[in-house]
Design a protein with these regions (language model features):
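Non-catalytic accessory regions of SAM-dependent methyltransferases
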Residues: 1-155
Length: 155
């Protein structure tokens, strides 16, 4: 696998950060289970054309180029710059799926980190109006030619 190659993948799962996980199943990759790629802005069930942007030993990262077949759980994000800013990582997913994702994340953490094997987390309580409530911002700081700067990354 090389950087800048395009592949068609089906998104099978989500990372803890909400990135879609699709596997490239090519014999030459030497991984019979498929080589996992983490792809922002994808939803479980999407069939997507992705471009490899970073390759590690056992996994890689891809950039979404095109949704070929959208998941039934895919919606158009309300925020017009959702893909560019990266602040609303789950906005392309139905709200019901977002709640399921959050529940699975808590269950997995309690099992994996907390060592609680037989834990069952109740369904996540949703909101009547689940939009425009953002209460967290991560603003990176850096330096440019004029000195210290702060802002958001545009993916």
């Amino acid at each position: 696998m090389k950087k800048n190659q395009d592949y068609i993948v089906t998104i099978e799962d989500l990372s803890v950060e909400g990135e879609g996980i699709g596997k490239i199943s090519e014999g030459e990759l030497g991984n019979e289970n498929g080589f996992p790629l983490f792809i922002k802005d994808t939803v479980i069930g999407d069939v997507a054309k992705v471009r490899v942007i970073k390759v590690k030993k056992n996994y890689g990262y891809g950039r979404l180029m095109e949704i070929i077949t959208p998941s039934p759980n895919r919606v158009k994000p309300l925020c017009p710059v959702a893909r560019q800013c990266g602040g609303c990582t789950l906005q392309c997913m139905t709200y019901e799926e977002q709640l399921k994702f959050k529940r699975r994340k808590v269950e997995n953490n309690l099992r994996r980190i907390g060592g609680l094997k037989d834990i069952e987390v109740p369904m996540t309580l949703g909101m009547e109006k689940p939009w425009r409530y953002r209460n967290k911002a991560q603003v990176p700081f850096g330096f440019d030619k004029e000195g210290i700067c702060a802002g958001f990354y545009a993916g």
